[in-house]
Regions:
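Extracytoplasmic cell-surface/polysaccharide-interacting catalytic and binding patches
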Residues: 6, 14-155, 160-274
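Positively charged n-region of N-terminal signal peptides that target proteins for export
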Residues: 1-4
Length: 274
C-alpha cells in the first residue's frame, strides 16, 4: 500500500514539473529585410572618390546623374583629360573633347558617299565616308526622295591634318573659345572616324537645314537607318558643342534605336553602357 502511494506521489510530481516547465517557442521568427537601393550598373568602384567629390560640389544632382557625368569625365574641363581611343573602327566608338584619335588614324574602307550630284548637290559629289555607312545612307537617301526631297552629304571624312587647318582658321578668325564651341580640335573630330556626316536637304544648306519643311520627318527616320543626331539642341554642357541640326552620326540600327529610346545623348549613353 505504501509503495503504491509513493508511486502515485512520484507520478504527480513529475506531471507537475512537466506542466509548469516553459514550453519551447517553436513559432517561426520572420526576418524583415530592408529594401535596398537598386544597384547602378554603370557604377565603377575605382571612381568612388571622384563620384563623392562631384556629388559634394553638385548636391542638386541625383546619384545616377553624378555617376553618369563622372563617367563622361565632366568632372574635368573639356580637353582637361585626354583619353586615347583604342577602338576607332568600332561602330560605337566615341570621339569627343575627352576621347582622341591617334593622329595617324585613317579608315581603310573609305568610299564616295554621294552617288550623284542631284538637283542641288553638284558641289557635294566628292565627299567620302566609311563603306559600312554606304548602304544605309543610300536607303535613307531613297526614302527622302520618295518623300519628295533630296539628301546630300556636305562634309564626310576629314583627316586629322585637314581638321587642324579648319580649327586653326577658326581660332585665327575668332578665338579659341569661339572655335571650341563649333569646331573640334585635331584628333577629336567625329569626321575623322568616317562615321560622322554633315548633311543638306534640297537647297537648304547645312546651317539652314532645320528650316526644311520635312526636317522633323527626316529626324524621325534617322534611327531606322542607323543614324543619330549627334549634337542635339540644349545639350551643349553634355556634348561640348553647340546645337548642330546638320550633323548625323552612324552607329548602326540597333544602337541608334536604343539611343533614341533612352532619350540620352550619345555621350551619356556611352558613359552608362561602355
Amino acid at each position: 500500500m505504501k509503495k503504491r502511494i509513493s508511486l502515485l506521489l512520484i507520478i504527480c510530481m513529475v506531471g507537475s514539473i512537466v506542466f509548469f516547465f516553459p514550453k519551447e517557442n517553436t513559432q517561426e521568427v520572420k526576418t524583415v529585410k530592408k529594401k535596398q537601393t537598386p544597384e547602378i550598373s554603370f557604377y565603377h568602384q575605382e571612381y568612388k572618390e571622384r563620384y563623392d567629390t562631384y556629388q559634394k560640389a553638385h548636391q542638386d544632382l541625383s546619384k545616377k546623374e553624378v555617376i553618369t557625368l563622372v563617367n563622361m569625365n565632366r568632372d574635368f574641363d573639356f580637353y582637361g583629360k585626354i583619353i586615347k581611343q583604342e577602338h576607332p573602327n568600332d561602330l560605337n566608338t566615341i570621339v569627343n573633347k575627352y576621347y582622341q584619335l591617334d593622329e595617324t588614324y585613317e579608315p581603310s574602307d573609305l568610299v564616295e558617299i554621294n552617288t550623284n550630284a542631284g538637283t542641288y548637290g553638284s558641289s557635294y559629289s566628292k565627299h567620302t565616308a566609311r563603306k559600312v555607312i554606304y548602304d544605309d545612307f543610300q536607303a535613307l537617301k531613297q526614302a527622302c526622295i520618295n518623300k519628295g526631297f533630296e539628301l546630300y552629304v556636305t562634309s564626310g571624312y576629314r583627316s586629322t591634318a585637314w581638321q587642324k587647318e579648319i580649327y586653326n582658321h577658326m581660332v585665327e578668325t575668332y578665338s579659341v573659345e569661339r572655335a571650341d564651341e563649333t569646331c573640334s580640335r585635331p584628333g577629336h573630330s567625329e569626321h575623322t572616324t568616317g562615321l560622322g556626316l554633315d548633311i543638306a536637304l534640297d537647297q537648304y544648306k547645312y546651317e539652314e537645314v532645320e528650316n526644311h519643311p520635312q526636317y522633323s520627318w527626316f529626324l524621325s527616320q534617322l534611327s531606322n537607318y542607323g543614324f543619330i543626331l549627334r549634337y542635339p539642341k540644349d545639350k551643349e554642357e553634355l556634348t561640348g558643342y553647340s546645337y548642330e541640326a546638320w550633323h548625323i552620326r552612324y552607329v548602326g540600327k540597333d544602337l541608334a534605336q536604343k539611343i533614341e529610346k533612352s532619350g540620352l545623348t550619345f555621350d551619356e549613353y556611352y558613359a552608362r553602357n561602355y
